[in-house]
Amino acid sequence: MGKEKTHINIVVIGHVDSGKSTTTGHLIYKCGGIDKRTIEKFEKEAAEMGKGSFKYAWVLDKLKAERERGITIDISLWKFETTKYYITIIDAPGHRDFIKNMITGTSQADCAVLIVAAGVGEFEAGISKNGQTREHALLAYTLGVKQLIVGVNKMDSTEPAYSEKRYDEIVKEVSAYIKKIGYNPATVPFVPISGWHGDNMLEPSPNMPWFKGWKVERKEGNASGVSLLEALDTILPPTRPTDKPLRLPLQDVYKIGGIGTVPVGRVETGILRPGMVVTFAPVNITTEVKSVEMHHEALSEALPGDNVGFNVKNVSVKDIRRGNVCGDSKSDPPQEAAQFTSQVIILNHPGQISAGYSPVIDCHTAHIACKFAELKEKIDRRSGKKLEDNPKSLKSGDAAIVEMVPGKPMCVESFSQYPPLGRFAVRDMRQTVAVGVIKNVEKKSGGAGKVTKSAQKAQKAGK
């Protein structure tokens, strides 16, 4: 078998009709985890419904519908393989909660694939002021997705078909735009494709002999290729933050007969080991970890990305809850945040937002109302330069530095230190009205918290 391939997470972004579903469906279909039987079933259904032309998108729609109905579908359906990687599509927009998911990120994307449509008038609609192309690309960059691939899709519907001139025009415009956001176009592969016909998806297209391939230049090494699949192979694999102190936001806490209290969550940074003395914030409880397990198997250590359950001694289910954060009591233990300074971008709010606004913030697994206590400055959302001090109010499209105060005890961190605990979505009126990254956190000096007997024992034993 050889060594298992590295796992990479991608997020697919772009305007609503750019062909994201068809392109993604095509990759999953040709390289993915969908078995022949399922594909034949989908094809038959698509044909019966007169949707033969949508078969790739249809695959994705079926998966999406199942995902939205809450049927936990086999996640392998969202995976496909390249020569180097196992790639998981962690989200595709069009999904209602796409923006929220991207931020509270069940997992952080290693790379964003931006699909733009080359068809007459389509590209213009997508990149216009109110098109989603800009918003998605800006979001991806703000939330720390620093690698980008651009697929110029629907090359079969340019005038004339497969037009080199049209492709060059789009590359020029998208390059200028992503550069404004912060991406360096020299490091971004641009690939002309047809997600429907399959041009340049997996192998070079005979329809575009003028396309000599894409090239990227970067300090980690240059790369070149022709197809979209090859471009995915140039993604730089993430370095997992094992060297940082432990941060594990709790998703749930269970009481299991004969075992006791078992918090469950995903290790975001650092390493969790049995025997470790951990502190939970903001509740300020310190105790010993008895055992750690994943998929019902005991682990000697859990690493970033692992979803684990762990058994803690002398702590009741009433003491800790979803949204609490677990960390190593001896290495930068997590603490309650008294207040924090954030850079926020207002996405869609019908009115004006002024100081005193108290929406719900979704940050890691916490879901807590926070007050915009002070609007410190309005900034240019691309360059970050200050436009105005103490603005009276903010509206859609504005970016600002805001002082925020949690309405209930909460543990968050700065984005620079612990990215997954430093980005958040602002929810109001059942939608995401803003996104933010945390610049710095003023910690509450908690005084002495509760230290359980088992923690004292473990500390005495000098663990």
Curated annotation (Swiss-Prot):
<dbReference type="InterPro" id="IPR054696">
    <property type="entry name" value="GTP-eEF1A_C"/>
</dbReference>
<feature type="modified residue" description="5-glutamyl glycerylphosphorylethanolamine">
    <location>
        <position position="301"/>
    </location>
</feature>
<feature type="modified residue" description="N6-acetyllysine">
    <location>
        <position position="439"/>
    </location>
</feature>
<dbReference type="InterPro" id="IPR004161">
    <property type="entry name" value="EFTu-like_2"/>
</dbReference>
<keyword id="KW-0225">Disease variant</keyword>
<keyword id="KW-0378">Hydrolase</keyword>
<keyword id="KW-0342">GTP-binding</keyword>
<dbReference type="GO" id="GO:0045202">
    <property type="term" value="C:synapse"/>
</dbReference>
<feature type="modified residue" description="N6,N6-dimethyllysine">
    <location>
        <position position="55"/>
    </location>
</feature>
<dbReference type="GO" id="GO:0005737">
    <property type="term" value="C:cytoplasm"/>
</dbReference>
<keyword id="KW-0479">Metal-binding</keyword>
<dbReference type="GO" id="GO:0006414">
    <property type="term" value="P:translational elongation"/>
</dbReference>
<feature type="modified residue" description="N6,N6,N6-trimethyllysine">
    <location>
        <position position="79"/>
    </location>
</feature>
<feature type="region of interest" description="G2">
    <location>
        <begin position="70"/>
        <end position="74"/>
    </location>
</feature>
<feature type="modified residue" description="N6,N6,N6-trimethyllysine">
    <location>
        <position position="55"/>
    </location>
</feature>
<dbReference type="Pfam" id="PF00009">
    <property type="entry name" value="GTP_EFTU"/>
</dbReference>
<dbReference type="Pfam" id="PF03144">
    <property type="entry name" value="GTP_EFTU_D2"/>
</dbReference>
<feature type="binding site">
    <location>
        <position position="17"/>
    </location>
    <ligand>
        <name>Mg(2+)</name>
    </ligand>
</feature>
<dbReference type="GO" id="GO:0006412">
    <property type="term" value="P:translation"/>
</dbReference>
<keyword id="KW-0251">Elongation factor</keyword>
<dbReference type="GO" id="GO:0003746">
    <property type="term" value="F:translation elongation factor activity"/>
</dbReference>
<dbReference type="InterPro" id="IPR004539">
    <property type="entry name" value="Transl_elong_EF1A_euk/arc"/>
</dbReference>
<feature type="binding site">
    <location>
        <position position="153"/>
    </location>
    <ligand>
        <name>GTP</name>
    </ligand>
</feature>
<protein>
    <recommendedName>
        <fullName>Elongation factor 1-alpha 2</fullName>
        <ecNumber>3.6.5.-</ecNumber>
    </recommendedName>
</protein>
<feature type="modified residue" description="N6,N6-dimethyllysine; alternate">
    <location>
        <position position="165"/>
    </location>
</feature>
<feature type="modified residue" description="Phosphothreonine">
    <location>
        <position position="239"/>
    </location>
</feature>
<feature type="region of interest" description="G4">
    <location>
        <begin position="153"/>
        <end position="156"/>
    </location>
</feature>
<keyword id="KW-0472">Membrane</keyword>
<feature type="binding site">
    <location>
        <position position="195"/>
    </location>
    <ligand>
        <name>GTP</name>
    </ligand>
</feature>
<feature type="modified residue" description="5-glutamyl glycerylphosphorylethanolamine">
    <location>
        <position position="374"/>
    </location>
</feature>
<feature type="binding site">
    <location>
        <position position="20"/>
    </location>
    <ligand>
        <name>GTP</name>
    </ligand>
</feature>
<keyword id="KW-0256">Endoplasmic reticulum</keyword>
<keyword id="KW-0991">Intellectual disability</keyword>
<dbReference type="InterPro" id="IPR027417">
    <property type="entry name" value="P-loop_NTPase"/>
</dbReference>
<feature type="modified residue" description="Phosphoserine">
    <location>
        <position position="224"/>
    </location>
</feature>
<dbReference type="GO" id="GO:1904714">
    <property type="term" value="P:regulation of chaperone-mediated autophagy"/>
</dbReference>
<dbReference type="GO" id="GO:0005789">
    <property type="term" value="C:endoplasmic reticulum membrane"/>
</dbReference>
<feature type="modified residue" description="N6-methyllysine; alternate; by EEF1AKMT4">
    <location>
        <position position="36"/>
    </location>
</feature>
<keyword id="KW-0597">Phosphoprotein</keyword>
<feature type="modified residue" description="N6,N6,N6-trimethyllysine; alternate; by EEF1AKMT3">
    <location>
        <position position="165"/>
    </location>
</feature>
<feature type="binding site">
    <location>
        <position position="22"/>
    </location>
    <ligand>
        <name>GTP</name>
    </ligand>
</feature>
<feature type="modified residue" description="N6-acetyllysine">
    <location>
        <position position="179"/>
    </location>
</feature>
